[in-house]
């Protein structure tokens, strides 16, 4: 069992009976974790740039208990204001891992080294124009106040993928 402690910036490991096994400091902000296999996990940092981390996704080697890389650079502009958390940002069915996030109309296939667009949700006139993400906001509240002046779909809040189907909800 792997537990991401966001506040302490640690990964805790327990056996399936709840006995503590190990603790590893990761020294950067991460809000989500997806276990790919026994040797690899992906840590998700959203748009939060840390001193030691500037990627949305960090590849973590579970065997060596160390970071082995990262991908999908965080936008400097979005790092100033776009900090939102979902309960989860991942869904797995079989060997397929999907990734999604708020304020995004795309569902991605996630591999241990890449994030590839898989599905696009056409929200039509309710889609957030890209120009909204290019403005300079001081914080998430300023951004959200601007969004609330419109009737936009804010993105996917939960997602489950199955063999021949996807179940999702969005705002």
Which positions does each model-derived feature cover?
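Conserved beta-propeller blade signature
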Residues: 1-3, 41-43, 96-98, 166-167
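Short, flexible beta-strand-to-coil junctions
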Residues: 6-7, 45-49, 100-105, 169-171
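Repeated scaffold domains used in trafficking and secretory/extracellular systems
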Residues: 28-36, 79-89, 153-158
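Residue-level detector of Asp-centered blade-edge/turn motifs that repeat once per structural unit
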Residues: 36-38, 92-94, 161-163
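Loop-centered beta-sheet repeat module
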Residues: 55-114
């Amino acid at each position: 069992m792997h537990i991401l402690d966001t506040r302490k910036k640690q990964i805790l490991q327990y056996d399936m009976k709840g006995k503590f096994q190990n603790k590893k400091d990761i020294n950067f902000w991460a809000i989500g974790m997806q276990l790919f296999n026994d040797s690899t996990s992906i840590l998700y940092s959203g748009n939060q740039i840390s001193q030691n981390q500037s990627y949305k996704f960090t590849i973590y080697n579970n065997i060596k208990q160390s970071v082995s890389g990262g991908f999908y650079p965080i936008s400097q502009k979005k790092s100033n204001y776009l900090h939102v958390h979902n309960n989860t940002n991942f869904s797995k069915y079989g060997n397929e891992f999907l990734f999604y996030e708020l304020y995004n109309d795309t569902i991605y296939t996630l591999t241990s080294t890449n994030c590839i667009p898989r599905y696009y949700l056409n929200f039509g006139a309710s889609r957030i124009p890209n120009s909204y993400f290019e403005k300079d906001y001081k914080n998430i509240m300023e951004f959200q106040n601007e969004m609330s002046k419109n009737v936009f779909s804010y993105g996917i809040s939960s997602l489950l993928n199955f063999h021949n189907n996807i179940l999702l909800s969005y705002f």
